[in-house]
Amino acid sequence: MKTKTNQSVKTFGIVGFPLSHSLSPLIHNSIYKDRNINASYLVFETQNLNVEKIQEFRNSGILGLSVTIPHKETAFTLADKADDTSRIMKASNTLLIGPDSTYAYNTDGEGAYHSILEFSPESLKTGKVVILGSGGSARGIAFSLAVSGKIQNLLVCSRNEITAKEICLLVTKNSNVKAEPISQDVLLTRKEEISLVIHTTPLGMKGQSPGPYLPEDFFNSNMTLFDIVYNPLETPLVKTAQKAGAKIIPGSEMLLYQAMKQFELFTGISPNAEDIIKTRERLSKALENR
């Protein structure tokens, strides 16, 4: 029987577009080696993700996929079953591919939440949280924060008013958090209310428009900025916030923690403190060389 992968090796991968700068293969393949796990993690760069593509992966022996831009919302629609975050927010960044069914998970929110708790837990207590953007990552992050019990108010600022309103409706309906869509112009007038800014759009990413999305006078030393873009780590938005004295959560931290959860979903093995430390060091070194 012809297959594209070695059946003695458990094969996983990442699907999205573009993927030339993805660090996910480094993360997963390194931890497989550290743990002596007979597995490999491949790159599947494609602009199209559909039922036929999932079946191709299944036929090729692919057991799990990390899903990134622009496929997170599509990934949810292709799954037969889904975790609560995926089901409620209608976006997934992880697919487990079984013989007869596909299961969707969203680890973005958990990754972001862990990052915030580690680097700036106070930012969840002192003011309102605003999420910039309304794509797949924003959905997972919004839900995880809403059900954490740590916040009471959430603002979503996006150029796409329809998806921003949808996220807010879903959050308000499924949690005790009051979520409110807000335009950029209005956000600028309410900056004193904000303690945490989470940027989830591609602006500032290598090869994308630089941004910065918000002006320097929006930020102050009482704010924290979490820009989930990690290539480069110092995006124009990060530099703008730094000049104003804002605290910065590195975007690579979300990549780290969401990948650790994916590793657990793929292999059934819980990552330990050493896995996290080693992966953080590898990411830091890789990003320094970019």
Curated annotation (Swiss-Prot):
Catalytic reaction(s) noted: shikimate + NADP(+) = 3-dehydroshikimate + NADPH + H(+)
A Pfam family the protein falls into: Shikimate_dh_N
Taxonomic path: Bacteria, Pseudomonadati, Spirochaetota, Spirochaetia, Leptospirales
CDD domains: NAD_bind_Shikimate_DH
Active site: K72 (proton acceptor)
Organism expressing this protein natively: Leptospira interrogans serogroup Icterohaemorrhagiae serovar Lai (strain 56601)
Family, as annotated: Belongs to the shikimate dehydrogenase family.
Protein name: Shikimate dehydrogenase (NADP(+))
Enzyme class at the top of the EC tree: oxidoreductase
EC number assigned by the record: 1.1.1.25
Classification via InterPro entries: Aminoacid_DH-like_N_sf, NAD(P)-bd_dom_sf, SDH_C, Shikimate_DH, Shikimate_DH-bd_N, Shikimate_DH_fam
Functional summary from the UniProt entry: Involved in the biosynthesis of the chorismate, which leads to the biosynthesis of aromatic amino acids. Catalyzes the reversible NADPH linked reduction of 3-dehydroshikimate (DHSA) to yield shikimate (SA).
Subunit architecture: Homodimer.
